[in-house]
Structures are given as C-alpha cells and as structure tokens.
Amino acid sequence: MPEQPIAVAMSGGVDSSVVAAMLVREGRTVVGMTMQLWNQRRLPELAVEGATTGRCCSLDDVYDARRVAEQVGIPYYVVNFEEQFEEHVVKPFVDEYLAGRTPIPCTLCNNYIKFDRFLEMADSVGAYHMATGHYARIRHDEATGRYQLLRAVDDSKDQTYFLFGLTQAQLARTLFPLGELNKPEVRDMARSMDLAVAAKGDSQEICFVPNGDYAAFMSAYLKEKGVAVEETSGEIVTTDGRTLGRHEGVHRFTVGQRKGLGVATGEPLYVISTNPANHQVVVGGNDDLLRGGFTAKDVNWISIAGVEPGAPVRAQVKIRNRHAAAPARLVATSDRDRVEVVFDEAQRAVTPGQGAVFYAGDLVLGGGWIE
C-alpha cells in the first residue's frame, strides 16, 4: 500500500521550503500547497507597488513556492481561501479594533485557516499529515493520551504563542519539522540544498495590512463595505477625568501605546484603556498600566485537561508575543472556558483582545483571550 502523502503548507519563504525539501530527502511522499488569502487589488488606495496579494501570499511568493516545489520534485497547488480568510480573520480583526480591543489575526488564521481549511485540502489529496514551517514542537503523552505542544528549541523564533487555539485533532495531524532547529541552521540547510529562496528575508508585518498601517486598512476596508467609520473626534482623558485633547477614533489606539497621542503634559503618557461607547481614550502614567491579573475567556486546554476548582495551577503566562512569560496562578471559575489569571507580580499593559498563553517550562498548557 503506497504511503500517504504529507501536505506541506508552502508560503514561498525559507522555512516552509526547507520543510518540503527535508521531507523529500527523508523519502516521504510530499505535496506542496500555497494558500491564497487576500487580494490587495480590492483596496487600491493601499496597494504596495508591484503587489497584488497579501505579503504572505503575493504572486512573488507563489512563484517562489512553485520554483522550490519543482526543484525538489513534488506536486504543487495553489488553494484559494480568500472568502474564508475574510470571514474568520479580516472581519474579526476590524470588528475587534472597533470594539476597543487589540486582535491577533495570526492566531485566528492558524485556528480557522491554516490548521482547519488546509487540513480539508490535505484530505482532498489523500494526505493525513500536514507540515508547516512553524517553530514549535509536538509530542504525544502516552500516559494521558494527549498531544502536547512545546516551545521550539530556538526560543527567539518560537511561535507557540500563536498556536494556543489548536485542538487535539489538529495536533494529531500536524508536523513541525523545524521545532528542533534554530534559524541559522535552517538558513544553512536552504543554502546547502541550493533552494531558490535561500537568501529570501523573513516576513514581519500582518500579511494583509500594507506597511503595518492597520488604521488606514480599516478605513479602506469599511469604505469598500459601505460602512461609515465613526470618525467624530472623541476625548482623550486622564485616569482622573481631566480632558487633555481630542482624537479621531478609538480604533487608532491600543493599550500601552505612547506614540501618536497628540497630547502632552510634560510626563510620558500611555493609553490605559479605550471606551468605544463614549469615544474616550484614557491615558496615564506607566504605573497606571500595571495589572495584578485578568480573566481569560474561550480557553483551549492543550497539554492538560484543565484547571479544577480549588486546585489552582502554577504557570508562566505570556500576554503578548514578545512578553517574557510571568509567574502566575491559574484559578478555575464556574465556567470551564474561563480562567482567572493572578500574577505573582503586576504586569504592564494587559490588553483586551490579546492572547494569554499558559506555559510550564517548555510545555504549552493552553491559552485563551484576555477579556
């Protein structure tokens, strides 16, 4: 009986290209696929010269992925997920900002597109496993029967923060071949295999937001939809209620932001919170950003079954990707999908809409969304 192929999600970058080449060298049957997610032509006022699609799925990226597939001798397909991407990633991204929260589109994309719709496409080519260029590790715990998610060996490239929504069913079918490698090793492998993308740089920004200007993207997107963004100036106020100035929309601000406030008091000011209902942006000093804890909602447990009432779990908690995980207690609530996070020491800029990911060493216990 022929071996089932492995479907590799190829972005046209170095990491996924090395994954495809590694698997071929191991003698595995591989099929390459690139996901078409967003067409930049829809919003011409934001178009970047020479680009017709989002940064992670531009025509250049498709061309690069196809070249690598031809190099390593595997079938290659482009699959169009633009409709699903807009529904599950772009629209929630816009809605969250308008609601005064700061979203993580990469996590939504992982949950609903890369590890959901893509697996459906893997089924269509007879593949059980999919492989990606993510820096993370998976192992199966024989004692509990659970698939566990672990940090990558290269902590500087670790992407587990964006993977906290993966289910047991998704983890069972996923391979992360780069989890035991560091980025320089991957670059060296790309060069040694003479891959066409060996010298290609890494993408940094949100793939569908040109130049990282999310406020401009939102305005253009809502204009296309015929929705008027509430641009009426609101107040910028201090934590004690003093009005310092006005702004052009709460969706332009996020907790912890310092630049672009347009007001000054002689002391550094930061966004403490936003209130879309009354169009207020609340600002204050650095100490006003400190929080002793928060509630995480829609919690997805990965490496453990959950937190039991009366039995808090110790963990290190990350509240954004570049945050150094902080020691905390996870306390059960009456709702299993919610957890109270109590830090040992107050943390700065706990931001509604961001992810909270719970770690025990390298092990990802689970994660949820900051309320």
Swiss-Prot record:
InterPro entries noted in UniProt: MnmA-like, MnmA-like_C, MnmA-like_central, MnmA-like_central_sf, Rossmann-like_a/b/a_fold
Gene3D superfamilies: Adenine nucleotide alpha hydrolases-like domains (2.30.30.280), HUPs (3.40.50.620), Translation factors (2.40.30.10)
Catalytic residues in the record: 109, 207
Gene Ontology CC, one term: cytoplasm
Catalytic activity: S-sulfanyl-L-cysteinyl-[protein] + uridine(34) in tRNA + AH2 + ATP = 2-thiouridine(34) in tRNA + L-cysteinyl-[protein] + A + AMP + diphosphate + H(+)
Entry EC no(s): 2.8.1.13
Primary localization: cytoplasm
Disulphides: 109-207
GO molecular function, one term: tRNA binding
Site (Interaction with tRNA): 134, 354
GO biological process terms on file: tRNA wobble position uridine thiolation
Location of the protein in the cell: Cytoplasm
Keywords, in A-Z order: ATP-binding, Cytoplasm, Disulfide bond, Nucleotide-binding, RNA-binding, Transferase, tRNA processing, tRNA-binding
Start and end residues of each stretch annotated as Interaction with tRNA: 157-159
Ligand binding (ATP): 9-16, 35, 133
The protein's role, per its UniProt record: Catalyzes the 2-thiolation of uridine at the wobble position (U34) of tRNA, leading to the formation of s(2)U34.
Record NCBIfam families: PRK00143.1, trmU
Family: Belongs to the MnmA/TRMU family.
Identification of the protein by name: tRNA-specific 2-thiouridylase MnmA
Annotated organism of origin: Solibacter usitatus (strain Ellin6076)
Gene: mnmA
